[in-house]
Every structure is written in structure tokens, then in C-alpha cells.
Amino acid sequence: MHQHIQVPPLEGKSRINYVNLPLINGDKLRTAKTLVDKAIKEKKVFSVQGPYPVIRAGLRARGWVERRLPRPSFSQPRRHDHETETTDEGDSSDEDDLGEEVERDDEAEDLYDLMSRLVRHETPYFYWTTRRDSVDCRSLRKEQMTNHYAKAGSFTTKVGLCMHLRNLQWFDAADPDTFFPRCYRLGAQDEKHAFIDDFRRTACTSLLLYVLEKYEGDSEGEKMGEVHNAKSHGLRKTRKQHSSQRIETSVIDSALHVCQEYLNSLEHCDIDNNLETNSTISEQQWKVFLQNYYLVVHEGINIEGCEYYLERCKCMLEQMRQVCPQMENDGICNIWIIKPGAKSRGRGIMCMNKLDDMLGLVDGDHCIMKDSKWVVQKYIERPLLVHDTKFDVRQWFLVTDWNPLTVWFYRECYLRFSTQPYSTHTLDSSVHLCNNSIQKHYQPSPDRSPSLPAECMWSCSQFRSWLAASGRAALWKAVVVPGMQKAVIQTLLTAQDSVEPRKASFELYGADFMLGRDLRPWLLEINASPTMAPSTGVTARLCPAVQEDTLRVVLDRRSERNTDTGGFQLIYKQAAVDVPQYVGVNLLIEGTSIRRPRAPVHKSLIQSHPEPLSKSTNHKSSLLSSPCTSGKENQSEEVKRACPNLPNRKITMDQSLIFHPKRKRPHRLVLPSTCCVLPNPTELHHPQRLSHTQPQSDRPHTHRTRSNLPTLYRPTPSVEVINIRPRQALTSSHYIHKIHTVNLSYPVLRMQQNHRRSKNTFAEREGPKSS
């Protein structure tokens, strides 16, 4: 212990306090060194941020030594005030956890202080922190453990939960609308318009339900034998009657029309409707309808002759219930809850029931609108009530691995009650928000049932006893618990690809549920770092047990697989997916060189040349020509002027080939005679006139250009004959004679060639034979 000795001040000098440092006991020092050496050898050094006396005590009992982190100065502005303005992932707070400090044992604390000083330069292998960003997971070794996963905001934030649950259809055959109230981001324009449509459609169904319940009463709840007969909550309040004012029945017709159009859209019947028959309600008509709806539901103004619409309203509501699983919770007041995504612990949450007020509130905050932080969610207007008081359920679950996904569900939970009786005619947070951080600022209302505790909490065992008194004890295990487990698993499946699956990490979460009148659980949100403050007698018993059982799962079970896990039970474990082994980057490009494409094979023996050919030497050896573009009017006129009208002609090519297979070199192709008779050029534009001529031979030929073949050097199409060869090899010299006849449209051109040439002349042209 530090001893402060006060010395009487001398004259003219101020008083000075002298501090005597305590003497270190040798036995205590040796004990500390022994424990520290063993902990360092076994890698059992931990660090805890915040009080958490249960975590510290549990780790010390297992032989761990704490390396204490520097404590923040309370004289400085608290860091969490800034952080919680930018995140809504958890509901834990250092201020709530201050009450966790247990009575100190001075002797033990001195030993722990000494051991902490001895390991001040050692590496902690276990981190337990309140906030995720207190430890950089990327800089941790693979054997270092921490109680947070990186990038878990995909389901622990209001925006992330709203977005990821929409992808549930890709992971499970389930509809998120069956366990999560429909939710929209008002910062996204498409979702904002979807919310407006949803609000208007809900107003229509609420109006029909109002008409039905006003004249028939809420007999459906009595038929179902519900725990609490919430008979027309929207009609309980005594409202001022406006006997002189009446609303026309056209408002009911509009509501029926909107509901029918919605049903048609689900059946895709609206696709066949023409634009002329499309009777979409205009914005002005919607404005008038909502004003009438507010007057009827909120002000109590009667609808003239609405009793004649009871059967139609009942029939339409039955059809809507089949396609809208949340219709039983919607009620008649059309209340929505607005949550600013940058705050947690119930701060900034408001309940509203008018569309213009909600849009005006969101549009006024441009910063939050820019980041899409505002979230609007349908309020559950008809929850299960205990003694006419609203409550929600806090349920813990633990994730120890994301690949494969491993989920542990805690067997016990607790209920948080409101301090005020439930009513939909007041939108005060003390009635509709059950967060302990909000309700602790209010005193229980004298109108609330005295059967409820003043600390506004029940354990799950107390709730089961209340259900048993109503004859519904079996529904806890048959409906409530399976529904909560299913909602947790399906939510984690949608976020699995977004979270970094670090093997040595784990995280404890707190899920908030509400129960419908049929005891079906509805997921509200999931909190990271749930508060462990012993604020009431219920949490003083449950929170330490949850922390101790968490250490059993994440530490004791690693060394002993069959160890007791306390209140945690394994509810889900995926099949393991093998991660490909990383062997480094080895980039290799394989392929072949690109070959030069071959020239296309020309099957036609006669081609047209639309442009004049040059007399240069290049054109003398060129036998290929471009296609004729005689389809153009200007070119056809030129052809008519250049060529007079001539009768139909034909071209006959008499070809002779001489082959000597016994010799080393084959003889060249010779053309004994060629006779060209060209037809009228005007008939080129009418190919059907030439159909009476002989068809061109379909015999395949292999074309190869030769310099000695005839070419018509004219400014008009020419004739080209290429490499005519026999089909089979000849055993001796044979003379082959072929005649090809084709139609042309030019004057007669006659070319004479010798039928045979002497061997000497042929040899001279071929040059000397190669040896």
C-alpha cells in the first residue's frame, strides 16, 4: 500500500506530500516470476479492454497472465462518444460496465500488478475488447485470439442487415419477410420509392381492416385463442366525434382497387393491360386518399355507408393475407420506425405514422441521406403483450468459425419490458422502445400492471411460467426457440461471404426479437459486443454465466473436445470447404503463333472488272478482279453508253492438254484456240434472261494462275481460266480436249493459238532442265 506522510510546512514554504513506494516481498516476486515464466512458455498472456471482471477471473483461473492496456483518462473526452456516432454495431458501453467492478482483494491485485509489469513486453495471445477497431486483425499472428471478426457490419448494422437479408433466396429456400419486418434505406432513391408504395398500400389494407373491425370486432383473435386479446388497439382511445363530417365511400373503393392491382401484379396480370386501360392513381389522388385515411383512423371520422362493404373488405383481406406474411402485425395505424444508421442503443429512433413527416425528416439531413444511413422499418403494431405491456427478447449466440460456419445458441435469454402500458396512439419512445438504456430513465407508470417487476426484466423461465398459466407452455420449444434459431442461421448465411473468416477469432452477439400474437419471433437487430452490465437481478445472474461459458467454448474445448460448454449448444455447423493452397504466383502464357490466313478459293472461272485496268506490268500478271457493281444507276448508264445493243452471244473456250507422265517435268498448259463471243451488256442487269443458256459445270476445279492464259485487257470484265488438270493419273501420253461455255456481255474477241507446239520450242521457253 502506498503511504502518504504529511510533513508540517516550514514557515514561508508550501506543504509537500512525500510518497513512500511499497517494498516488494521476495516470496511474492518469486511466485510472480514462476507464474509469468509458465504463462510465457504456454503462450498464455492476455489483454482486456474495459472492466469485464468475469473474463479476467476466468482467464486467471486457467493460468493466464494479463498484460494490462493503458486506461483512458476520464478527464479527457471519452472516445466512445465519437465512435458511437459513426457505428451502430453494438449496445455495450463502458459506462454501463463500470458497475461490474467487484470487491478488490488488495493482496491478489498487488500480485497481478506485479505479473502484468513482468509481461509488459510480451505478446498477448488473447484479446477481449469492447470495440472491433481496438485491435487490427491484419497484424495479428495466426495463434493470437480476439473476440471480434473483421467486416461483420454486414449483419450487425441496420443498413447491412437490411441489405443482406434480401439475398436470402440464394442461400436458403426461405422468405425474409416471414421473420424480419420489411425495411428500406431512405438514402437510396429506388428504395425510397419502394417505401412510398409500401406505405400507401399498407394504408389501404389498414383502412379495410379498420372498417371490418369497427363493425365486426376483433373476433379473429378470440378464435385463435391468443394470449392477449388486443381488441382494436386503434379504437381504444376515446376520440372526439365529428358528427357533422363524413367521408365518402369512394375512399374504400380506392383501397379495394389498389389491393386488387397489387394482387394482379403478383400474378403478372398487369402485363396484358394496355396503356389506355391502365388506371393508375395519380399523385394528387394519393394525397387526397391519405388525408381521408388520416381523418378516419387517427381522428375517428366515420365513413358514410361503410357497412355495405364488409363482405368485400373481408374477402380482399383474406387474399392479401395469403401474399403478405406480415399483415397480422401491420395493424391499422400504419406506424413506421425510423432508425438513424449512425447511432446505437436506441438513440435517435423515432416512431411516425405520416408519410410527409418521415420524408421531411430524412430530406432535411443531407449528410445522412448522402451516406444512405437512414433506415425505415415497419413497426409491429400488434405484438404479444404481457399484462398490456410491450417487451422484447435478448438472445445470445456465439460464432466460433465462418468456414465452416459454426453457431452456438445460448439456452437462456431475458425479456425487457417497457415502463408504460402499450398504446398505438402515442409515439413516445418510453412506450415503444424496450432498450434498457432508454427505459432506465423512466419510472414505471402507475397504470402498468403491478405483476411486472420494477426493474422491467424477466428471465425466460419466468416467461415460460406465464405461458404455462395460459396453457401455452409447449409453444416455447415448438415455436419460439426454433424460430429464433432459424432466423439467426439464415441471417448469418447471407453475411458469410462478407465476413473475414479468421480461424483464431470468435464473437459473441446479442439478437433482439419481438414475438407476434401467435408467438412467432421477429428479428429486430443483431448487436456486436452486447452489454454485460449487471443492471438488474436478471442480468447479474445471466451475464457472468454467458461470459464464463464463452471461455469454455473458445478455450477449454480447444484442448478437450468433450468438455462441458455450459449453456451454449451447437445448433449449426456447415460442411467444411477446402481452401486452395497458396503456392505463390506463377504466371505463364501459352499459345501458338498466328498464321497468315490463306487466300479464299475462287470457284468461278469468269469474273467481272468494273474499273478499267491499267496497262502497267502489275496488271499483266494479275488475274484476280473485283466484283462488278453494276447495280448502281450511274455505272449502268455508263455501260449502256459504252456498249451498243448487241444480240446475245456466248463464249466458247477450246482447251487442249498434253501430259507426259514418264518425263521428269510436266508440260505446260496450251490453249489451241479460244473463241469469245460476248452478249449484250444490258442483259447483265437481268440474269433471268440468261436462264436458257447452258448451266455452268459443277465439276470441281483447282485453280492456279498461269501467265500464259488469255486475259481480256479491256476496261470491262475479263475472262480467266485457271489450271485445268485431269482427274486421274495417266499411264501414257494422252490428249485431253475440253470445252467450257459461259455467257458474257461484250463484243467478240477471237484468239488463235497453235494446237501443238514442238518440243524444242517448249523446251526453250522452259529453260534448261535441272540436273
UniProtKB/Swiss-Prot annotation:
Signal peptide: none annotated. Its EC number is 6.3.2.-. Its main location: cytoplasm. Residues 86-106 have a biased composition (Acidic residues). GO terms for cellular component: axoneme; cilium; microtubule; microtubule cytoskeleton; sperm flagellum. Coiled coil: none annotated. Mg(2+) 1 binds at residues 512, 525. Residues 70-106, 605-640, 682-713 are annotated as: Disordered. PANTHER family: TUBULIN MONOGLYCYLASE TTLL3. Monoglycylase which modifies alpha- and beta-tubulin, adding a single glycine on the gamma-carboxyl groups of specific glutamate residues to generate monoglycine side chains within the C-terminal tail of tubulin. Not involved in elongation step of the polyglycylation reaction. Preferentially glycylates a beta-tail peptide over the alpha-tail, although shifts its preference toward alpha-tail as beta-tail glutamylation increases. Competes with polyglutamylases for modification site on beta-tubulin substrate, thereby creating an anticorrelation between glycylation and glutamylation reactions. This is Tubulin monoglycylase TTLL3. It comes from Danio rerio (Zebrafish). The gene is ttll3.
